[in-house]
Amino acid sequence: MCGSSNANAIDSESLCRGSLTIAHVDENQDINYINLEGRKTRYPNIRRGYEILRETEILHVQLSGDCCWELYSRHHFGGHKRTILPGEEGMITLDFQPISLKRMECYEQYNSD
């Protein structure tokens, strides 16, 4: 169930394993990739850590592993939000340019109906 509203992402010292690959294109239409992995879970301004993103446009992202990712249109986790869940495969296009991101544990909420 990709994108299901029944999933909650819990911000923590992430125990999940995974990465987010960001494909970005420059003015010459050259596509390059940034792979976010490791211990870091919060990126309040991705353009500060990866200055190339100030001059390029993000085309799509690709998820690997069992983590949820939250992408925001403004720095410090503000603006529009898009949650990407494990199981969303392939190139995921966004309707905004993400500026801040969080990697999180994913937990399902189940109704007892």
What kind of region is each of these model predictions?
Residues M1-D113:
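Compact beta-sheet-dominated domain cores in extracellular/mature segments
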